[in-house]
């Protein structure tokens, strides 16, 4: 969690706990939106929807590690977001998930969730989203809604083009997220 200069109406330095709760719902909602077509195509919509909603704000657990605290004030006073808030980390994690699961939909979902998180945070500034580069440390605010719309579109394409994946017993597998 960090003050969003690009979204000043979403945070309040006087109310860091309220800002943290707001950030959880914002990141969870955006994450669910960007992979909603894949979630809706799944047999376990509710479970996957909840996991996706939790996954969006879970990206911010790196703040807790960097601040060594769960206190919202400690999280807000970090100089910048941790280096794991980067496109490089998103791509590396996506590649690792794909190597382990061989699931394009699951891997895409991980990438879309993290990138949607980065889009929102980078529009607020102080985000080394192209780590290890220090600049640019933000994106134009309009890139956030455009990027989120493109992620949703790509998820729609992914959900409509992928055949149902089955495990060795012929059952739909977890990869059908």
What does each of the following model-derived ranges do?
Residues 1-177:
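N-terminal membrane-targeting hydrophobic helices
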């Amino acid at each position: 969690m960090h003050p969003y200069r690009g979204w000043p109406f979403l945070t309040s330095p006087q109310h860091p706990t309220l800002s943290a709760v707001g950030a959880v719902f914002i990141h969870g909602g955006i994450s669910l939106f960007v992979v909603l077509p894949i979630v809706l195509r799944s047999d376990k919509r509710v479970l996957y929807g909840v996991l996706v909603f939790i996954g969006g704000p879970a990206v911010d657990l790196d703040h807790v590690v960097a601040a060594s605290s769960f206190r919202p004030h400690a999280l807000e006073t970090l100089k910048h977001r941790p280096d794991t808030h980067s496109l490089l980390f998103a791509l590396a994690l996506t590649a690792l998930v794909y190597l382990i699961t061989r699931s394009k939909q699951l891997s895409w979902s991980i990438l879309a969730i993290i990138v949607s998180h980065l889009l929102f945070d980078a529009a607020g500034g102080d985000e080394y989203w192209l780590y290890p580069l220090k600049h640019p440390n933000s994106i134009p605010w309009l890139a956030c809604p455009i990027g989120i719309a493109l992620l949703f579109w790509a998820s729609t394409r992914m959900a409509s083009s992928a055949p149902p994946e089955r495990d060795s017993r012929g059952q739909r597998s977890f990869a059908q997220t």
